Amino acid sequence: MYFCVVNVFESKIICKTFQGLEQVLAEELIALQAKNVEVIKRAVVCDYDLEILYKCNIALRTCLKVLVPVFEFESNSPEDLYGFAIRIPWENYLDIHQSFAIDFTIQSEYFKHSQFAALKLKDAICDRFRKLNDDKRPDINTDRPDVLFNLHIHRNQVTISLDSSGTSLHQRGNRVEQTIAPINEVLAAGLILLSKWDKASHFVDAMCGSGTIVIEAASMAINKAPNIDRNYFCFKNWKSYDKSLYNDICTELSLQTKSFPFKIIGSDNNKKAVFVAQQNVKKAGFNHIIEIREVSIQKMIPPLDRGMLIINPPYGERMQTFETDRLYKQIGTAFKEHFTGYTCAIITSDTVALKNIGLKPYKKYSLINGKLDCLYCLYEMYEGSRRKPKEIAAE
């Protein structure tokens, strides 16, 4: 077998995201001064730079994982994959006393069982270490490995990367509890960035659930890097880890935070959701910025003047058709009666019920929430006469 493995380490960084958020992520990378930023499907690529690598993990809001490709080669079978992989110098990237794991994404007629391909790669790594270290090998840890490899196979093209993040970057460490079907933090951040909220006006989520959207909004409002308080990153276990540089970046980003003179309000008519949101806001350290109210969107009285409203109402199997139609009519009424001067946005998979809002969006985006195809619609509620219903006791 002809051995042709190309070492591409420290050439590119791949930042993975959700479908529909690629351009937003690209704009974030450009703001970090990343070089040669290129959008691909569900990811954005840029030139490798150690400082950028650390900043991607700490500061990007719409990034799920930060990968660094290490090896590329062609393979037509699991056995072929093993034959190539056992000759790769894994000892340059993994110490025998460290643990490791393998993530994989495989779309290939040559590898019909994705897990088996990942198993062959794991066997190759372990067998190489056994051969070099008197039958000793690194441990496997699928929960929190020291080093995480990513195996990507498309047809017969194999790319093995180092996953610098470890666990997904949406895990900000803010959740004490969660409600049913909470929105992912990366998607929540994407909704806010797509809305073009200027962070110089009020922000409201009138169906806030566990508070994810308002927490992401508060983080943006004060310019706090989303993962600056996170301790676990796999890059900290790499041989190339520069602790001094990492600490300098954290200090630099910490000094960029600022005050926010406007209001951020989350509300929900579910008592349990309100309690969960309050706990999560407290855990995130945003008690002084975010106010959580127990009130329905129909009775919610937002701050006057202009602002941004983003909601993620229940949809899919969680709602019956008649309930959904009625709810969306109420949402449309609330937009018109209570939120003049605001930009209002809604994400939903129920495009039929969406028509009951009775408004024409000025902007629409196709996104995915979990496994559901969704529309994200934005409405400009121009200044005009505003009804003034009595404020309820809950406020």
Language-model regions, residue ranges each:
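Conserved S-adenosyl-L-methionine
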Residues: 183-302, 317, 325
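Helix-rich interaction surfaces within compact, conserved domain-sized segments
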Residues: 367-387
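Accessory substrate-recognition/RNA-binding modules or partner subunits associated with SAM-dependent
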Residues: 9-147, 164-166, 170, 177, ...
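Short, positively charged and aromatic/hydrophobic N-terminal segments
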Residues: 1-2, 6
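Short SAM/SAH-binding signature in class I
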Residues: 306-312
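Short glycine/proline-enriched loop/turn "hinge" motifs that connect secondary-structure elements
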Residues: 91-96, 152-153, 303
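Class I S-adenosyl-L-methionine
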Residues: 105, 152-194
